Amino acid sequence: MKNIKLTVQYDGSKFYGWQKLNDLPSVQLEIEKAVTKMVHQPVKINGAGRTDKGVHAKGQVCNFIVDTDISANQFLMGVNHFTSDSIVIVKSEEMDLDFHARFSAKSKTYKYILCNKYYMEPWFNDYKGHRKYYLDFDLLLKCRDMLIGKHDFTSFVNDLEEDINPVRTIDEITIEKIDDDIVFTFKAESFLRNMVRILVGSMVDVARGRKSIDWLKNALENKDRQSAGITIEPSGLYLMDIEY
């Protein structure tokens, strides 16, 4: 038996997310079909992060266990051959059998790119978020300082399941102004569903002047989804890296 780890990049605008959803286009389904063609047996792919529809990845990781003589390098070439141009396998490795892409992960890093000028070039529509109004960068930094650390993020998750612990520790948040873009980077051991997008949406509300810093503090304390901001569009979100 072999445990193969793949590092994957994909254009999320072409898929209904990472996870299989009936017969709708998904990254997981396409990779599973590609591997199945190579090994001639059903294969289950485990993903490190379940990115939503429209969310991209530069460093997604998945693994699968299979009885085969095919080498890791052959899987790199073969999966790239059988998948569409919207998916690229950039690395393939054979791991110990106890390795799991999701449960072995030590941290995940997401990036959100927000174009902040009056208009955005149309070819960026699927690859950046967009806000045309002025955003106060100093207020964004104050939001950042409040959100770093261990908190109950119930207010910043959609469809929280009863058995999921909403407490998470954000290790790092960086915010950079790069030309006309504001780039948010979040690093944590794990994230809740839509957590990064809701955090960015809430921070933007404060930076725009619609909400106050105290409002954001209360949103954390209230543990109620209605207390926080919107779920910003998925187009600007990228899963950048998984550390093990």
From Swiss-Prot:
Gene3D superfamilies: Pseudouridine synthase I, catalytic domain, C-terminal subdomain, Pseudouridine synthase I, catalytic domain, N-terminal subdomain. It is an enzyme of class 5 (isomerase). Its EC number is 5.4.99.12. It comes from the Bacteria. Keywords: Isomerase, tRNA processing. Coiled coil: none annotated. CDD domains: PseudoU_synth_EcTruA. The active site is at 52 (nucleophile). Substrate binds at residue 110. Belongs to the tRNA pseudouridine synthase TruA family. Homodimer. This is tRNA pseudouridine synthase A. It comes from Finegoldia magna (strain ATCC 29328 / DSM 20472 / WAL 2508) (Peptostreptococcus magnus). The gene is truA.
